[in-house]
Amino acid sequence: MGRLSWQVAAAAAVGLALTLEALPWVLRWLRSRRRRPRREALFFPSQVTCTEALLRAPGAELAELPEGCPCGLPHGESALSRLLRALLAARASLDLCLFAFSSPQLGRAVQLLHQRGVRVRVVTDCDYMALNGSQIGLLRKAGIQVRHDQDPGYMHHKFAIVDKRVLITGSLNWTTQAIQNNRENVLITEDDEYVRLFLEEFERIWEQFNPTKYTFFPPKKSHGSCAPPVSRAGGRLLSWHRTCGTSSESQT
């Protein structure tokens, strides 16, 4: 009986030693199997590529680019196509907080998400949504909720939150000029803390810009020395008319 007990104890000791030796390997394997939070950096200007497959095909965010596309544009990946994929991955909600929004491709992506039943909310700057080519009017016409500021300063944020878990932010204005010509950056991250902070900021602004709180004659914005009254957008010269909140354009 004593000999049997000794053998059992020895076997248990060997088993424990092997388990302890294998434990670090098991933990490393489990950690490697765990999905890592997304961290992606995009840099602009973006190469001009065809984005029709992303914006037209069912399940667009997963669609492959068509081999027989009649357009003469390249059909590879670009910073813009990667940004579109990140947006089109939305399944429940998309919150946009954007200073300027005139990119037709990004505008179509937002409308496509709305058509799929994704809840889309947009916060923007009241003056820059009056630019010729702005997508804001089209989004409103499609039934998407849009709120704007009435502050003397600009609503200068440039971020999006996808499904309350993915943050897209950076220097990029959502305009063709910025996408194709400017040195810009966009960070895409699933960092929980950053997503939480930006979501809190969005909700705060969304409530602050509630239309029931609007005043009929808000104070006019002052350009100051760093914001000239003339700007370029899409190759056109835009001259601001602050008294009516519109702009005129001349070809350059």
Curated annotation (Swiss-Prot):
Kindly report, in one word, the top-level EC class recorded for this enzyme. Answer: hydrolase
Membrane topology of the entry: Single-pass membrane protein
User: Keywords, A to Z?
Assistant: Differentiation, Endonuclease, Golgi apparatus, Hydrolase, Lipid degradation, Lipid metabolism, Meiosis, Membrane, Metal-binding, Mitochondrion, Mitochondrion outer membrane, Nuclease, Spermatogenesis, Transmembrane, Transmembrane helix, Zinc, Zinc-finger
Q: Where are the zinc fingers (C3H1-type)?
A: 45-78
- In this entry, the parts of the chain located on the Mitochondrial intermembrane side of the membrane are 1-4
Q: Which residues lie on this side of the membrane: Cytoplasmic?
A: 28-252
Reactions catalysed, semicolon-separated, are:
a cardiolipin + H2O = a 1,2-diacyl-sn-glycero-3-phospho-(1'-sn-glycerol) + a 1,2-diacyl-sn-glycero-3-phosphate + H(+)
Per UniProt, subcellular location reads as: Mitochondrion outer membrane; Golgi apparatus
Q: What is its EC number?
A: 3.1.4.-
Which sites are catalytic? 156, 158, 163
| Record's subunit section | Homodimer. Interacts with MOV10L1. Interacts with MIGA1 and MIGA2; possibly facilitating homodimer formation. Interacts with GK2.
Q: What protein am I looking at?
A: Mitochondrial cardiolipin hydrolase
Native source species: Homo sapiens (Human)
